[in-house]
Curated annotation (Swiss-Prot):
A GO molecular-function annotation: ATP hydrolysis activity
Record SUPFAM superfamilies: Domain of the SRP/SRP receptor G-proteins, P-loop containing nucleoside triphosphate hydrolases, Signal peptide-binding domain
Keywords: Cytoplasm, GTP-binding, Hydrolase, Nucleotide-binding, Ribonucleoprotein, RNA-binding, Signal recognition particle
Record's GO cellular component terms: signal recognition particle
UniProt gene name: srp54
Top-level EC class: hydrolase
Biased composition (Gly residues): 446-466
GO biological process terms, semicolon-separated: SRP-dependent cotranslational protein targeting to membrane
Residues reported to bind GTP: 104-111, 184-188, 242-245
HAMAP family, per the entry: SRP54 (MF_00306)
Enzyme Commission no: 3.6.5.4
Name this polypeptide is given: Signal recognition particle 54 kDa protein
Family: Belongs to the GTP-binding SRP family. SRP54 subfamily.
Localization (cell): Cytoplasm
Length: 466
């Protein structure tokens, strides 16, 4: 993820306090300077970095660590709380009828974000509709229509009209049954007067409940001026940051939030319509510092299980009752794939997103995903009987399956060994009572190790239980 380098740098800085029980002024100053370097290299605005540094320095020197708390954990808690304060609250988006206008420069990801937001609202039980008003960019209508079809949400646009205001007004009429209207507007390569005039006219015509500014994570230091101009024109209520799965540094968008006195609403984390997260400050910073985010993880697990259950006529609860088959394993892997890239999932698990992940080779995630794909191809080459009873698979079947899947016999055997291990684990879970499961979840929340330092937040709570 785009902010991985920032998170790794911050965790490395805090790890320098490992084993210390007290803090000297020199310790604090070194930590503050390292944090400044990390944030500035991530394109966070200089003024914001200085304000954050002053707060961390003052608290680290003035506050006494609670009894039994290490110097590292004390500073970690301070950094966590101050960074949550820095990114601010999430934009208020009640699950009710509303109209949202998206603004931003061309190429910022407005059209993709419109479809993603519509998909997100649909998963919350509302009926959304996207209204495409961009008459400036060739292909805007086709892209929006295709994205909305993939998201399975209502769409309105008129490729034959060159009047964006008329399209917006007609769109509201044609999609009157929708609960949430998301109006996608045109962009330009620069903040031209024509763009601002058009945006103001659309805003006046549709009278939106909220205006969201869509910013590419690569915007850097230019975010502040851009945000100020849009805010002066229509008033910005929140920011959606896109392309956080790329190589941009991402910190510049925080200046836009500060400049407009608004907050972050959504994060775009990939190319698929489902690759969008509602911004939750405590979980976001918790992940950044290697402490996990169990709330976001549980939402992804629930969504992935529901989708797999619908597609495969498979109930995950059956795993706790009978024999764990290769078919069950394949369904589990399908659900994992639906949760998103493996490195993002690891960031949400306390103890894995920090120290353990930082120690892995750069290509470890890609290799793991590739091996999972190999396993899926192998299982697709098996008969129904083999999927239901893998213990009956002998050498001749292994040879046939390897040929049919285009893999080698060793990889087939590796899959069978992996299944045996998972089958043993499932038997252990089947023997657990509710109390055992609750204790295990509590250990996960408190777990960490490596570069951890605390559990991820559940139910909106931070890793320190505030």
């Amino acid at each position: 993820m785009v902010l991985d380098d920032l998170g790794s740098s911050l965790r490395g800085t805090l790890d320098k306090l490992q084993g210390k029980t007290t803090l000297s002024e020199d310790d604090v100053e070194e930590i503050v300077k390292e944090i400044q370097r990390s944030l500035l290299s991530a394109d966070v605005d200089v003024d914001l970095v200085m304000d954050l540094s002053d707060s961390i320095r003052e608290r680290a020197l003035d506050e006494e660590p609670p009894a039994g708390t290490t110097a590292r954990d004390h500073v970690l808690k301070i950094v966590y709380e101050e960074m949550v304060e820095l990114v601010g609250e999430s934009t208020a988006l009640p699950l009710e009828e509303q109209t949202i206008v998206l603004a931003g420069l061309q190429g910022s990801g407005k059209t993709t974000t419109a479809a993603k937001m519509a998909w997100w609202f649909s998963k919350k039980g509302l009926r959304p509709a996207v209204i495409q008003t961009d008459t400036f960019r060739p292909g805007a209508y086709d892209q929006a229509k295709e994205m909305c079809e993939r998201a399975e949400v209502d769409f309105y646009g008129n490729p034959d009209s060159d009047d964006p205001v008329e399209i917006a007004e007609r769109g509201l009429e044609e999609t009157a049954d929708a609960d949430v209207h998301i109006v996608d507007t045109a962009g330009r390569h620069a903040l031209e007067e024509a763009l601002i005039d058009e945006l103001e006219a659309i805003e006046s015509a549709v009278d939106p409940d909220r205006n969201l500014l869509v910013l590419d994570a690569a915007i850097g230091q230019g975010a502040k001026d851009q945000a100020e101009r849009f805010h002066d024109a229509v008033g910005i209520d929140g920011v959606a940051i896109t392309k956080l799965d790329g190589t941009a540094k991402g910190g510049g968008a925080l200046a836009a939030v500060d400049q407009t006195d608004s907050s972050i609403a959504f994060l775009g984390t990939g190319e698929e319509v489902k690759d969008i997260e509602r911004f939750e400050p405590s979980g976001f910073i918790s992940r950044l510092l290697g402490m996990g985010d169990l709330k976001q993880l549980s939402e992804r697990v629930e969504r992935a299980m529901e989708e797999t259950q619908a597609e495969e006529d498979w109930d995950p609860e059956d795993l706790m009752k009978g024999e764990f088959t290769l078919k069950d394993m394949r369904n589990q892997m399908n659900a994992m794939n639906k949760m998103g890239p493996l490195d993002q999932v690891m960031d949400m698990i306390p103890g894995l997103g920090g120290g353990i992940k930082d120690q892995l080779p750069d290509d470890a995630m890609d290799m793991t995903q590739e091996r999972l794909r190999d396993f899926e191809v192998i299982m697709d080459s098996m008969s129904e009987a083999e999927l239901e009873n893998p213990r009956a698979i002998g050498q001749s079947q292994i040879e046939r399956i390897a040929r049919g899947s285009g893999t080698d016999e060793d990889t087939v055997r590796e899959l069978l060994e992996q299944h045996k291990m998972m089958s043993r684990m499932m038997k252990q879970f089947q023997g657990m009572g509710d109390g055992d499961m609750q204790r295990m979840m509590k250990q996960m929340q408190q777990g960490g190790g490596g570069g951890g330092g605390g559990g991820g937040g559940l139910g909106g709570m931070g890793p320190f239980g505030d």
